[in-house]
């Protein structure tokens, strides 16, 4: 009879990773790293877009607020043209003019205590896809005075203004052609409707009452 085979009392030694196991582990690590980077990149892009959207919202809100404030503080004060021969109406706007809107407004802040009027002449024009706001440093400018120009709104496709007269009729031009002198130099509309179409925001409508 053959003697029984004695089993080793020592446990089997741990085997090392095989080449296939190492490749699988590396593949899993690579996939997890790629997923982690993709998630991080997506989060960065999302945060960047959110910041851009917020900045755009602030730009549009600021531009509209300036426009509405100018209209709300319009006053009946015509100005002399640069040559001093004629007067421009205190409020004018509409298609077919050099500027979309031009008016005299009150409330020009003077924190520096300069010797100037608190009335200000401002105008708006659509230049390319930008609405520009301009103002003169003096109320009755001469040919040597240069306006201060600011890009107020960008990405603009179109802008339309409508003016409500005292008879509750809407006009696309102000002063209305039927309004005789000198009334046309001093009369302001009761309200102004602003329709602006943006490339990214679509159409925005604002209605503002002009100071009485």
Language model features: what each stretch is:
Residues 1-2, 13-40:
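N-terminal single-pass transmembrane signal-anchor helix
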Residues 35-142:
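Extracytoplasmic beta-strand-rich oligomerization domains located immediately C-terminal to a leader/signal peptide
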Residues 77-80, 151-163:
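Structured surface patches comprising rigid loops and adjacent beta-strands/short helices at the edges
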Residues 113, 141-150, 172-173:
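A short, polar/proline- and glycine-enriched secondary-structure boundary/capping micro-motif
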Residues 115-117, 143-144, 154, 187-189:
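Short solvent-exposed loop/turn micro-motifs enriched in small/polar/acidic residues
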Residues 117-121, 147-149, 202-205:
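Short, mixed charged/polar active-site loops
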Residues 157-212:
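Short linear sequence signals and composition-biased patches located at protein termini or domain-edge surfaces
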